[in-house]
């Protein structure tokens, strides 16, 4: 079983849904990063259950304890261990599924592979193990923030309800204030109503979560087998319930022409009035001014001056269909990822399954406390996965000193 991810900045997670505790050990974080339990707690609070009607009613404080890696309020370069003790387990709810695998869950595959499988609340396969992701992600985000990198996320779709494209301020301000974590106020209301409708029916619904990383420098990523987008896709797919990943335009590139989606370059400091276009809607706005932009002449510039642009000027792209990554390497534009999250498989509707002990087909109606939609709580997990990968690549590419952040 693989429980560790990352080359330099790495996470080893441990624990299970109904075990004594869940947590993570983080290796590779340089010394002298100011870090407190509160830094991690505020992220865990975004993930914890029982906060509103559209989350699991399981009541957990998810209070984190840092038991190593911090000295005098700063990281000391040694492994950081964060642990959360489980408080509100109801393991008896799961005795009925001991030998009857739940449709949509990993019960059957885990039992087939390992034999000795903790079926209580999904055990190690539960979404609750993402507590470890969030602990590590909180540290990664604190590290990235000190280098001007911000990672944010929001829900863009629940069921068939899609949010309108909103600016970054709405995502940062409004998405954090509503239970659905959506930046479009009107869509957020409709999404919440839809989730409650499915909850009333004993069913669940899926959706899409978008995560954006701002301020990432050009140069992260190690082709051929260490591509930044490859590592991001892997990290995001390793989150439970995620069944698909897109970067930039994603699957829409399959129906596009290169002339439509190639991200054209420009010198940001040379033409300060040019905008960075980060989404599909703004691309059309750019095309209206494209000819005018292309006709600008580099007069009175000799070859020496032109070459200086490569080091003295920031280079941007007029669109961002690539999602901030070209050839497996970051290009300095915002990194944009989206994950498709399946409906929570634990539902109270009657379903067909098999009894592995009796060797016969049977019916199952799942008990327990479950989310009618996991998307709102998975936003912070997606942020964490992206932040962990970026922190690792920042260290691998030399943007962060590996032992002491004050030395860079």
Residue spans of the language-model regions?
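Short acidic, glycine/tyrosine-flanked loop/strand segments centered on an H-E-D-like triad
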Residues: 97-123, 352-370
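Glycine-rich, mobile lid/loop segments that gate access to catalytic sites or pores
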Residues: 112-224
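Glycine-rich anion/phosphate-binding loop at the beta-strand->alpha-helix junction
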Residues: 13-20, 202-205, 209-279, 292-361
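A short glycine/serine-rich beta->alpha loop
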Residues: 10-13, 117-129, 218-222, 320-326, ...
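Internal helix-turn-beta structural module
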Residues: 10, 343-408
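Glycine-rich, N-terminal phosphate-binding loop and its surrounding beta-alpha-beta segment
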Residues: 44-103, 107
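N-terminal, positively charged regions that mediate nucleic acid binding
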Residues: 1-58
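Alpha-helical support elements that line or immediately flank enzyme active sites
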Residues: 20-32, 128-149, 230-234, 333-335, ...
